[in-house]
Amino acid sequence: GHGKSSGKFTNGNITKWSNETSILIKKYVKKNNFTIIGSSMGAWIALKQFQKFKSQINSFLGIGSAPEFLENLMWKKFTKKIKNEIIKKGIYNLKHGNYEYPITYQLIKDGKKNKVLNKKITSKINVTLIHGMKDEVVPVSYSRKILKIFPNANKKLIVIKRGDHS
């Protein structure tokens, strides 16, 4: 994505990044309670952690949260031509602004296996979501969808009027 971490983005997927995050939590947080924070796709990875660390997570902060964006904001909106290219070549370089993002077919397929918006998280925790009203990448409605999966949480959505996705 946007970061400067080592490794090739094209070798990763939601399952891999979620598992790596879980390993880090086990190693460094151990059995302590913690707040989990995620931005954009990182919020999706953070939400996946509730499956393993639900009793330890005492709050969640999401910024421009983008769970399930691969299917809903990409695959469903791609033209047949783009879909065929991804299936045939295994990759499509998605141009957005000054960036080009290599979207692999394995990433799209893996995203479908990692749904988080269809399962309630019943923890009584603080959930704060921050989203830019001018976010053209991920609509504010995604943050509202996340709030719905936390029926027992103390929830807050902060919408930044001039905020975008970056």
Task: Annotate each language-model stretch with its function.
Residues S55-I103:
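Hydrolase active-site cap/lid region
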Residues K134-V138, S166:
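Acidic catalytic loop of the alpha/beta-hydrolase fold
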Residues G3-Y28:
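Catalytic nucleophile-loop/oxyanion-hole region of alpha/beta-hydrolase
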Residues P139-K148:
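Short alpha-helix in the alpha/beta-hydrolase fold that links the catalytic acid
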Residues K30-S40:
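Alpha/beta-hydrolase fold nucleophile elbow
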Residues E100-K120:
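Active-site nucleophile elbow and catalytic-triad environment of alpha/beta-hydrolase enzymes
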Residues F150-H165:
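Catalytic histidine neighborhood in serine/cysteine hydrolases
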Residues T122-S123, L129-H131, D135:
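Short beta-strand/loop motif that positions the catalytic acidic residue
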